UniProtKB/Swiss-Prot annotation:
Protein name, as recorded: Turripeptide IX-23
Protein source organism: Gemmula speciosa (Splendid gem-turris)
Single GO MF descriptor: toxin activity
Annotated Gene Ontology cellular component terms: extracellular region
Disulfide bonds: C53-C68, C58-C72, C64-C79
Top-rank lineage group of the source organism: Eukaryota
Length: 82
């Protein structure tokens, strides 16, 4: 998870450094908008564990499986945590 965050931050920094002229300013503006969107998603990312998760996807979804320490309840599809 930490490595994923570091890669994303590095990508945002690289996108912000791609300033250009001679017709590349439109691409730079789009990259800036994408970088802003990525950072906004990182800042507003949910900290709480997911409340519900499909018991089949629970074991396949890395975000869900990191919170479902006690497994997923197959009847209610609720993510059980210890």
């Amino acid at each position: 998870m930490m490595a994923k965050l570091m890669i994303t931050v590095m990508m945002v920094l690289l996108l912000s450094l791609q300033q250009g002229a001679d017709g590349r300013s439109e691409r730079w503006r789009k990259n800036q908008m994408a970088a802003s969107s990525i950072m906004r998603n990182l800042i507003t990312a949910r900290i709480d564990p997911p409340r519900y998760c499909n018991h089949i996807i629970c074991y396949e979804d890395s975000e869900c499986s990191q919170w479902c320490t006690a497994g997923c309840n197959s009847i209610t599809s609720k993510c059980d945590t210890l």
